[in-house]
Curated annotation (Swiss-Prot):
Domain of life: Bacteria
Disulfide bonds: none
InterPro entries according to UniProt: Haem_uptake_protein_IsdC (IPR019909), IsdA (IPR050436), NEAT_dom (IPR006635), NEAT_dom_sf (IPR037250), Sortase_SrtB_target (IPR017502)
Keywords noted in UniProt: Cell wall, Ion transport, Iron, Iron transport, Peptidoglycan-anchor, Secreted, Signal, Transport
Primary location class: secreted
Compartmental location: Secreted, Cell wall; Secreted
Gene3D superfamilies: 2.60.40.1850
Name of this chain's protein: Hemin/hemoglobin-binding protein 1
Listed Polar residues bias regions: 154-178
GO molecular function: hemoglobin binding
Length: 207
């Protein structure tokens, strides 16, 4: 009986690993421009960094040919004197001295996993003198992606098609082929589980 339970537990864990992989693959964004929520977390943990408050949300993500470029706004711009993402300095696209903000952009290799970054803070105030560099990570929430500019490019012919209301307020619809693959995977898992349980029961009977 213990062998049956162990086998069943293994199948369940194995199934979840495959399903999570499939969901990650389906979450990939088509070519287009999106608003995406994100959190600045500490470099060595999943906890929010103090720097999180210095980055305005959401970010704007442009996907072109499968490559993603992120644009976001930094507040307290005078304090944030340096920002590097995946080892490269970000590009400053605009500054606003009156609001003490600046917009930056940078390419990222992935949106599915936290992106390594480094920040440099220099504060020279009467009440505070602080100079430090430290590691952070940018954790993007692909599930929050909303299409912007009223259009999403088709990956088939690279043309731009109007986005429907559902595109602008919900996740990007997954292709039907992915749904079929998912159902096929469910079938394999179900058959394998049933066959394994029957085999183990037969062995138990003949012992």
């Amino acid at each position: 009986m213990k062998k049956v339970l162990v086998f069943a537990a293994f199948i369940v864990l194995f199934s979840f690993s495959f399903l999570s992989t499939g969901l990650t693959a389906q979450a990939a964004l088509k070519d287009g421009t999106y608003s995406v929520d994100y959190t600045v977390i500490q470099g060595d943990s999943d906890s929010a960094s103090m720097a999180n408050d210095y980055f305005d949300k959401p970010a704007t993500v442009t996907v072109n040919g499968g490559k993603s470029t992120v644009s976001l706004q930094v507040n307290h711009s005078k304090w944030i004197t340096g920002l590097w993402v995946e080892g490269n300095a970000v590009s400053v696209t605009s500054k606003n001295a009156s609001s003490d903000t600046r917009k930056v952009s940078f390419p990222v290799s992935t949106l599915s996993n936290p992106v390594n970054a480094k920040i440099k803070v220099d504060i020279d105030d009467d009440d505070l003198n602080y100079h430090h560099e430290y590691q952070i990570k940018l954790r993007f929430d692909e599930g929050s992606a909303k299409a912007l500019a009223g259009a999403v490019k088709s990956s088939d012919n690279n043309t731009t098609t109007p986005a429907t209301k559902s595109d602008s307020s919900n996740k990007v619809t997954n292709p039907k082929s992915s749904d079929s693959s998912q159902m096929f995977l469910y079938g394999i898992i179900f058959v394998a589980t049933g066959a394994g349980l029957i085999l183990l029961k037969r062995r138990a009977i003949f012992k």
